[in-house]
């Protein structure tokens, strides 16, 4: 081996070691969830609010139970309830919370979970929800299973922002990562068995507005992030 070759290899090795050390130094290690009040979904989410009351005759389920082991790894807590209004209209609420939204642990989107359960994804649109905390983006799905139609509205909070899509999510993760922090994440999903999509989405909007308004002020940012219009 000539001196030139040896020197080149030494420089390459030194660069690799430096890059490895830099990557390790920049790797986020502080969980945002550990710095704030602990999350307890069962006590945070009221069982009665506005015209909605929890239905004691049954409850909704987190979709995709075959992947329970994976879901348990991704989420620290999940909550599933069914609420009804005085006219008997039922809305299913599912909330999943994960304290670690790093690359290896990602929130499970309904676009993935529903088809895994045998549902057909008929449409997907992105709109907004007007909540007591401000306006946030929300995703609306139309899913079907046989003759059953289930319109879905959901939104995802990563750290302190509502995100739509993987690019927005990654940007929020990078912002936290620059400070050495790992953001937490929450996915809030409301759905109903209803063949009339427009009616379903309107009632889901009303439900979400009432829900957020009934949650204690100190917990609202967990559900809705920092609103985009403030």
Predicted regions and their residues:
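N-terminal Lys/Arg-rich, disordered targeting/topogenic segments
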Residues: 1-2
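A short, solvent-exposed beta-edge/loop patch
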Residues: 6-14, 18-20, 24, 31, ...
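Alpha-helical transmembrane signal-anchor/signal-peptide segments
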Residues: 29-46
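A generic "functional-site adjacency" signal
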Residues: 39, 46-47, 77, 182, ...
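Hydrophobic/aromatic-rich, well-ordered segments within soluble, folded domains that form packed cores
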Residues: 44-59, 185-192
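Short, solvent-exposed recognition patches
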Residues: 53-56, 60-176
């Amino acid at each position: 081996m000539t001196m030139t070759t040896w020197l080149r290899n030494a420089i390459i090795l030194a660069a690799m070691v430096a890059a490895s050390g830099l990557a390790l130094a920049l790797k986020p290690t502080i969980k945002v969830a550990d710095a704030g009040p602990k999350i307890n979904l069962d006590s945070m989410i009221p069982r009665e609010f506005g015209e909605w009351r929890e239905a004691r005759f049954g409850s909704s389920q987190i979709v995709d139970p075959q992947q329970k082991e994976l879901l348990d790894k991704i989420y620290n807590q999940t909550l599933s309830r069914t609420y009804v209004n005085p006219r008997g209209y039922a809305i299913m609420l599912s909330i999943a919370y994960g304290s670690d939204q790093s690359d290896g642990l990602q929130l499970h989107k309904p676009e993935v979970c529903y088809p895994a359960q045998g549902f057909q994804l008929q449409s997907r649109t992105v709109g907004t929800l007007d909540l007591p905390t401000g306006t946030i983006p929300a995703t609306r799905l139309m899913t079907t299973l046989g003759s059953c139609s289930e319109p879905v509205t959901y939104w995802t909070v990563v750290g302190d922002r509502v995100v739509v899509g993987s690019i927005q999510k990654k940007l929020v993760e990078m912002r936290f990562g620059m400070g050495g922090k790992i953001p937490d994440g929450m996915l809030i999903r409301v759905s109903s068995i209803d063949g009339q999509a427009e009616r379903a989405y309107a009632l889901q909007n009303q439900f979400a507005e009432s829900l957020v308004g009934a949650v204690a002020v100190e917990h609202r940012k967990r559900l809705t992030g920092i609103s985009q219009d403030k």
